[in-house]
Amino acid sequence: LTASSLSKRMEDVTFKKEDGQGQYLYTPAQDEIVGPITGPEKETADRNAKGTAPNAKQGNVVSGMYNESTPTTKTNPMIVDMNGFNLNVAAESDNKIADAVYVGNNDYITVKNDAGKKIGITSTNTNTRAANGIFLEGNSHLNITGPVEIAKVHTKGSSAAGIAFQGSGSEAVIDGSLTISNVDGDKAEKQGRYIGVSGIRMTGDNTSMTVTGPVNISGFKGSALHTAGADSVISVGGG
């Protein structure tokens, strides 16, 4: 290829001084990384963390993000560093509970998002078991830098939540905005009873949910905020 014969792909083409030969300089795109997140990660490309087979909680939960075996403490959590890339987390189950993000007993998980990329979460269950966007067991701790968008939570059953707490002493903090929409259950819809459908549901004592930015929970039948435990607190929008 020479300067006189170049007819296509003009953008980003340079020519060598020595012989006038054209060259196209580019950085190859990184392939998207797929599969569940099961331990600390620092992303090097867009991350599509999807779980489709039983994995978390000794195989009783299908999850796209959970701590498989990393010892964690308050000062040494399992860190998922998005490193400026996109992150989508999904659970797709046909026989077990679907929890896109699952935080087990005594676990500490932190999602680092310095670039402020949107974190997308979906959870679907073609079985009648529960589906949750984020699920926290007892004494579990989750910190995420948002924005976070839980765009779909669906089950054929009656129990579905954008964020669900089940156990005492757990805490979730989203530093940024939170959107929860399209939470539903086929059985709940059929019966016209939506007691198990919630945006944020807390059933443990001494639990707390904090969102520092704006919150939009809409587009479904059921309760936006549901608390059933003693001394549990939901604080949204800095209030």
Annotate each predicted stretch with a short phrase.
Residues 28, 33-34, 74-75, 79-82, ...:
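All-beta strand scaffolds that present successive hydrophobic residues in beta-strands
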Residues 1-14, 21-23, 32, 38, ...:
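Extracellular beta-strand/beta-solenoid scaffold signature
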